[in-house]
Amino acid sequence: MGKVPSSFRSMPANLLVRKTTPSPPAPPRDFRNRTAVGGDSAKLPQNTQAPREPSLRNPFKSPNLSDAKSLFNSIAATSRIPLDLKFHNSVLQSYGSIAVVNDTVKLFQHILKSQPNFRPGRSTFLILLSHACRAPDSSISNVHRVLNLMVNNGLEPDQVTTDIAVRSLCETGRVDEAKDLMKELTEKHSPPDTYTYNFLLKHLCKCKDLHVVYEFVDEMRDDFDVKPDLVSFTILIDNVCNSKNLREAMYLVSKLGNAGFKPDCFLYNTIMKGFCTLSKGSEAVGVYKKMKEEGVEPDQITYNTLIFGLSKAGRVEEARMYLKTMVDAGYEPDTATYTSLMNGMCRKGESLGALSLLEEMEARGCAPNDCTYNTLLHGLCKARLMDKGMELYEMMKSSGVKLESNGYATLVRSLVKSGKVAEAYEVFDYAVDSKSLSDASAYSTLETTLKWLKKAKEQGLVP
């Protein structure tokens, strides 16, 4: 033997090392007494990733502990090079990827006993900790067991330890255990950094009621002086906006000043998007005006969101006014801007106006996409402008533009109702050949429409 297996030699020694981050400033007011009207996300900076299984072939053929000890003893006895920390970490990670937590810990203890020169490092215990948190057979007692081993070997759990444990538990759906462990580690050892705190907060928002999230925020602040930052507030506001609880969102915004923070453009855009989704154009405009009053400069996303919301609410003239404001502010309208406006115009029956907007869009060098064409196709067919609709369809077909379900269904129904069944079959063929829709979906729409036509003829509703 004599050679260390390549899969052991390939594992990096500093797999889990990362820089710590200072805690956030400024406390918010008490959340505890707030109750949510709705039920239960802001992007977070990427943080430490817990260790993954080795990419090369695992030298351990079986999870059997005796076999693992024998393999390790054989390598240790015949190796011509010193076995360093990297090697021992690789052994534990490779074996841990196929074994239960209890056996992995026992192999670690065997290595300690049989190798007097082995001094486990922090990365060693983080490998064991990650395995204890991720293993499907593991309980929280195994996590505590690894943490106790760490302390007994002279290494206090730090922010990296908390980060690895919390992320690993959350990624396996054990959010309650992650929450309890964070509080325990904060009390006994070290508070989490902002990234870990916000990571857990985001997961709590995804799977817990809002009052549970507020209780966690209050406990961490009151008991451990760990306070939410602007990212934390953005996570909370994004969560309540997604649950359509916009009153709570505005409440949280009103408390940002008390917490020493100033809302940024991203946060205002999040709230505006919530109002626009509910077709509350006036409230969306109110958010825009508040931004301006607070000295927060709107960006392209702000204008696109506002134009989308106003168009959806049928307030097309206002949407066009903000299109001009957007250009005056130095932002070039993009495909999303024009498509939103076209959709609003088609909803109001202004399909020809939407079609002229397509020409304006292309004249400005902005390329329409599949959604743009399908929006116009749907609008023209709904307005019974079949000549224009077929002209647009032929242009789409020659350019290889795919049909979307709404545009396809409206076109097929309009053709059948106009007595142009052969043309409807041709549209069906294109939808299938271009893989715009599945065969079943495309045929279902055509079949339903033809059944309607047959019934209408029987009742004398159509010639």
From Swiss-Prot:
Gene3D superfamilies: Tetratricopeptide repeat domain. Residues 1-63 are annotated as: Disordered. It comes from the Eukaryota. Pfam families: PPR, PPR_2, PPR_long. The keyword Repeat applies. PPR repeats lie at residues 121-157, 158-192, 193-223, 229-263, 264-298, 299-333, 334-368, 369-403, 404-438. Transmembrane segments: none annotated. The keyword Repeat applies. PROSITE patterns: PPR (PS51375). Keywords: Repeat. Belongs to the PPR family. P subfamily. This is Pentatricopeptide repeat-containing protein At2g17670. It comes from Arabidopsis thaliana (Mouse-ear cress).
